[in-house]
Amino acid sequence: MKLSRRDFMKANAVAAAAAAAGLTIPTVARAVTDAGSDGITWDKAPCRFCGTGCGVLVGTQNGRIVASQGDPDAPVNRGLNCIKGYFLPKIMYGKDRLTQPLLRMKGGQYDKEGEFTPVSWDQAFDVMAAKFKGTLKEKGPGAVGMFGSGQWTVWEGYAAAKLFKAGFRSNNLDPNARHCMASAVVGFMRTFGMDEPMGCYDDIEQADAFVLWGSNMAEMHPILWSRITNRRLSNDKVQVAVLSTFEQRSFELADNPIIFTPQSDLVILNYIANYIIQNNAVDQAFMDKHVNIRKGATDIGYGLRPTDPLEKAAKNPGSDASEPMSFDDYKAFVADYTLEKTAKMTGVPQDQLLALAKLYADPNIKVVSYWTMGFNQHTRGVWANNLCYNIHLLTGKISKPGCGPFSLTGQPSACGTAREVGTFAHRLPADMVVTNEKHRQIAETRWKIPAGTIPDKVGLHAVAQDRALKDGKLNAYWVMCNNNMQAGPNINADRMPGWRDPRNFIVVSDPYPTVSALSADLILPTAMWVEKEGAYGNAERRTQFWHQQVKAPGEAKSDLWQLMEFSKRFTVDEVWPAALLAKMPALQGKTLYEVLYVNGNVDRYPLDEVPADRLNDEARACGFYVQKGLFEEYAGFGRGHGHDLAPFDAYHKARGIRWPVVDGKETLWRYREGYDPFVKNGEEVRFYGKPDGKAVIFALPYEPPAESPDQEYDLWLSTGRVLEHWHTGSMTRRVPELHRAFPEAVLFIHPLDAKARGLRRGDKVKVMSRRGELVSIVETRGRNRVPQGLVYMPFFDAAQLVNVLTLDATDPLSKEADFKKCAVKIEKV
C-alpha cells in the first residue's frame, strides 16, 4: 500500500479523531494490517516503540508477521495504534536485515582496519572472548563495559546485569535510558526515595487540567494525547497548558500555549511555588504531615571533563548535598521569583504565567503534569523534576485520581528494564544501589555468589564510557540494542575516536547495519521483538509479556541467547581473584553460565512448562524455561517492599499488570491509603521510600545553561523526534511508507531568521557548532514553528548526524546529556 505525505498525515488525524470519538481502527489502518485475512494467527504483544505500552495484535502466517492491529482489549490504547504502530510488521523485514555475524578481517584474521566478513557464531565469540579475557587479565574489570538499552526485555537486562556486575565484576554497565530517563530517576529518588510515577494513565479521564512541560505528546505519545484530546473536547471546563521552547503539534489543543527561553523553565517552576504560597493556596495540613523541606547545593557544574573551564569554575561540582530548611526560609527563597522577574527572564507574557499558576493553586482543579525530554535532557534536569514535585506537594495534588506529576518514558522498557531491573552503572534491582553494602549483600545472596563479588564503586555512565574509550581506559566494549553512535551527544569528541582506537575492541548487537554497527569491529545479528519471548515495563508501571511468534531470520539470535552463550566462554577461575573464589570453592572450574544462570534459581522451571505449541528458542537452547527462571529470581528482589511483581504466569494471561501487585491486585495510585497496600489504614498518604514516610521539597535556583548563543554562534539548537520516526530511525526508516512521509531531516527555522541570512525554504544550509558541522535543508513552515533565535532538528537521519553539533554537558546528578540547548551558526551552501 502506498501513502503520500498528505494521505499519511490525514491518516494520523483520522486515528486521533477515532480515539477521541471512541471508534475502532480507521480504514487506512485496516488496509495496512490486512486484518481478518484467512489463515492468519493472532496473538498479543506490546508495541515495539515508545514507553506508552500500547497493546497490539500480531498476525502471523507461514512463519512471517503479515499483519498487526490495535488490541481492543488493551487498556492503554483500547484498539488504537499510532501510525508507527500500524506499520510494525514492516520493521522486521528490511532488505538489509543482518543474518550472520560480521567481523572486520584482513588476510583471514581479525583486523581493526579490515572489511566486515561473515563468520560463524563460534568464530565471533572466540575473537570476542579473547579480547575480553585479555583486557580483564591485563587491566582488570574496570576496562570492560557494556552499553545496553531501554528496549531490552526485562530478562535480557537482568541477564546482562548479572554477567557484568557479578560475572565480570564490572559496574561499567549503563543503558541508553541514561540519555532519556536518568534525570527522572534521580528526581524521583531525591524527592520520594523510590523511582517511577505514583499515578497512572487513568488520571487522564479524571483530571481537570493537563500541563505539558517540554513534552510534545501529540507526536511522541500520540495515543495518550488522543485520550487527553478526548477529555478536553468532551468537557469544556478541562484546560490544557503546553510549555515548550518552540511551537509544536501539542499547541493545537492548548488553552495556554507558552513558549519560553531555553533553561528558564526553572524560573517558571519557582514562580508557581511562590504564587501558591503568596496566595495562601498551600495545603498546610498535607505539608505538615507528609513533607520535609531541604535546601540543595548550588553551582554544581555541568558534568564536563574536570579540565573544562566550566567545571573548574564550579564551587560544588557534582554535589547532591542538601540541608534542612524551614517553611519560612523556603517562602523567602521563592519570593525572589516574582511575576515581573519571571516574565522578563522567560520571555513569557505575565497573563500566561498567571493563568498557569492559578491552575495549580486552585484547590478545585485536579492537575496532572506531564514531561519528557524537555525536562530530562537538561543540565539541571533533576532540579526541574524536583521543582515540579514541589508544586504538587505544596498543593497536595499528588497520589490521587486526576492529580500528580508524571514523567513519560520514550522507550518500551526504560522503566521495566533500565530502571526496575537496575541496568544503570549505579543500580541493582528494585531501586538498590551498588554503593550500599546491604544492597550488595542482598544481591550476592540471591545470586548465590561470594560476598564481595559486586564492586562497591559506581561504574562508568554513558558519557563517561565515551571518554574512557577515547582515553584508552575502556578497551572491551559491547553495545546492545541501541544506536549510540548516532544517538549520543558530541559524536566527534570522544565516541568516534574511542571506537576506532586500535586499543579498543567494539562489539555491536543489532538487527540492522546502523551507524553504530558500521563503526564497530564485530557485528552480531539480533532477533527482534516477537522473534523471542519478552517482557516490557511501560511508563505507568505496567509489566506486559508476549510469546515468541516467529523465528528470527538466518543466524540472528536474541540478546538473551547472546549474553548467556557468551558467558559459557569464561570460567570463574579466569575472571575472579583467588581470594574471592576461595569463599565458595565449590564454584571452582565452573563457567559463568553455570554460576549465574544454572544456579538452582534460573534453571528451576522445566522445559515442559513452555507450551508445546509455542516457539521459545532460548528456552529450548537452555533446556529449561529460562525466561521464567530469570524473571522469578529478579522479582524476588522487590516483593514485600513496594516493588512487588505478580507471578510470571499471570502476565501471559493479562494485558499488563501495574506494580506493586499484592494478593493478585494491581496498584493504580501509590502512596495513597485505599489504593496502595503498603499504606496502612489511617495514614492517608505515606511516601514509604523515605525512612520517615515524608517526601522532600527542594529549594533550588535558576542556573544558566552550559552554552548559550553569542555573536558568532548566534542561534539556539534543540534536537528531538518527529511523529513518523522513532529515535535514530533504524527501524522506521526501513518502512517505505514512513520513510516517504519524512524522508530526511530538515532544519526548522523562523522565516525572519532565514530571511536575515539570505535563506529560503528548501535551501541547503551548513549548520556549525564549536564541535562539528553538517549540511541540512531549510524548513520555514510545517509542524514545528520555532521562535526567532532558535532552530530545531530531528536526529533520525543517519545522513545528517545532528549529534556532531551537540554538547556533552550533562546534569551533574543524573549524568544525562542536554540535547536541547547548544549554540550554532548557519550559512548557505
Swiss-Prot record:
A GO biological process held by the record: Mo-molybdopterin cofactor biosynthetic process
Gene3D superfamilies found in the cross-reference section: 2.40.40.20, 3.30.200.210, 3.40.50.740, Dimethylsulfoxide Reductase, domain 2
Signal peptide: 1-31
Molecular functions (GO terms): 4 iron, 4 sulfur cluster binding; electron transfer activity; iron ion binding; molybdenum ion binding; molybdopterin cofactor binding; nitrate reductase (cytochrome) activity
Residues that hold substrate according to the record: 795
Function: Catalytic subunit of the periplasmic nitrate reductase complex NapAB. Receives electrons from NapB and catalyzes the reduction of nitrate to nitrite.
Protein name, entry field: Periplasmic nitrate reductase
Originating organism: Edwardsiella ictaluri (strain 93-146)
Gene label: napA
